[in-house]
């Protein structure tokens, strides 16, 4: 899968609230009421990631979950990252 160009990434990110570009990755931090809610969200993220066969880097800090998406094989952001970011945004809404 090919990397997306800068203009395409910027345009597509306008459609996915809360997600930002950070270098060659898409990132977002979700904040929950407590650790239990954060972990429940992470488990749902894991299910979606398995279905998509595309796995984010996940950092958990008590009630905060930081997600980072990139396609290592392509060396940057691809349609797979955009598609998973969309699904994760829907999951959190």
Curated annotation (Swiss-Prot):
What the entry lists under InterPro entries is as follows: PCD_sf, Pterin_deHydtase
Family matches, as Gene3D superfamilies? Transcriptional coactivator/pterin dehydratase (3.30.1360.20)
Keyword set includes Lipoprotein? no
Q: What is its EC number?
A: 4.2.1.96
Task: Please give a single GO biological process term from the UniProt record.
Answer: tetrahydrobiopterin biosynthetic process
Q: Its catalytic activity?
A: (4aS,6R)-4a-hydroxy-L-erythro-5,6,7,8-tetrahydrobiopterin = (6R)-L-erythro-6,7-dihydrobiopterin + H2O
Task: Give the keywords, sorted.
Answer: Lyase
Q: Which Pfam families match?
A: Pterin_4a
What is an example of a GO molecular function annotated in this UniProt entry?
Answer: 4-alpha-hydroxytetrahydrobiopterin dehydratase activity
NCBIfam families reported for this sequence: PRK00823.1-2 (NF002017)
Question: Would you identify the family this protein belongs to, as annotated?
Answer: Belongs to the pterin-4-alpha-carbinolamine dehydratase family.
Among HAMAP family, the record links this protein to:
Pterin_4_alpha (MF_00434)
Q: What is this protein called?
A: Putative pterin-4-alpha-carbinolamine dehydratase
The source organism is: Thermomicrobium roseum (strain ATCC 27502 / DSM 5159 / P-2)
Its ancestry begins with:
Bacteria, Pseudomonadati, Thermomicrobiota, Thermomicrobia, Thermomicrobiales
């Amino acid at each position: 899968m090919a990397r997306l160009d800068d203009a395409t990434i910027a345009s597509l990110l306008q459609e996915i609230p809360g997600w930002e570009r950070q270098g060659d990755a898409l990132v977002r931090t979700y904040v929950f009421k407590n650790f239990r809610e954060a972990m429940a969200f992470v488990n749902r993220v894991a299910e979606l990631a398995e279905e998509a066969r595309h796995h984010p880097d996940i950092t958990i800090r008590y009630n905060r979950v930081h997600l980072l998406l990139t396609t290592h094989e392509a060396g940057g952001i691809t349609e797979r990252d955009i598609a998973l970011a969309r699904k994760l945004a829907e999951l959190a809404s």
